[in-house]
Amino acid sequence: ILILNQQTVTAYLDKGNEVQVALVDFTFKTKKLLFATNGFANELTKGAVHPARAQVLITESIQNLVIKGAFHLDKGYYYFRNIGDRILLGGGRNLDFEAENTSEFGQTEIIQKKLEQLLKEVILPNQDFQIEHRWSGIMGVGSSKNPIVSQLSDNVYCGVRLGGMGVAIGSLIGTELADLV
């Protein structure tokens, strides 16, 4: 099994006995092709999946961290969990849906400030912390909350539109996709 990350598929052709796949820098042939691109699946699904940026941060180690588990705030627009003795916090796209409906990676001041405010005032009040790292990911969302797990042609399949729940349901969708093959 060959897994290619951070590649852009420019075209593919299912020829019945093989699939030809063209990437930006090279092409290859395979017997089966499975797409799990999620937020980058708009063209693949004829518009059924749209990108939505998710901004995330993680703290440095926090002495005597008592928070354990995974939590959601504000109708799920914010989510946090402990990772060992650190807090991972993400969300806030509801502050600027238009700007966050993008496939561009990056952070915005309005969302990063809100994430820091939540850490200071709600999640870790009266506790010192430092932010170690910030990043973003691209989720796949659509008009339906149901994921798309389907066969696109004889040898091409997709498992996409996880609706921001990729970490929670990604393994299940992967199993369903494998069962199709």
Task: Give, region by region, the residue ranges found by the protein language model.
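Hydrophobic/aromatic beta-strand patches that form the interior of the parallel beta-sheet core
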Residues: 4, 34, 157-159
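Flavin-binding catalytic cores
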Residues: 63-65, 101-136
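A conserved beta-strand/loop element that lines the FAD pocket in flavoprotein oxidoreductases
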Residues: 1-9
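Flavin-dependent oxidoreductases
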Residues: 8-88
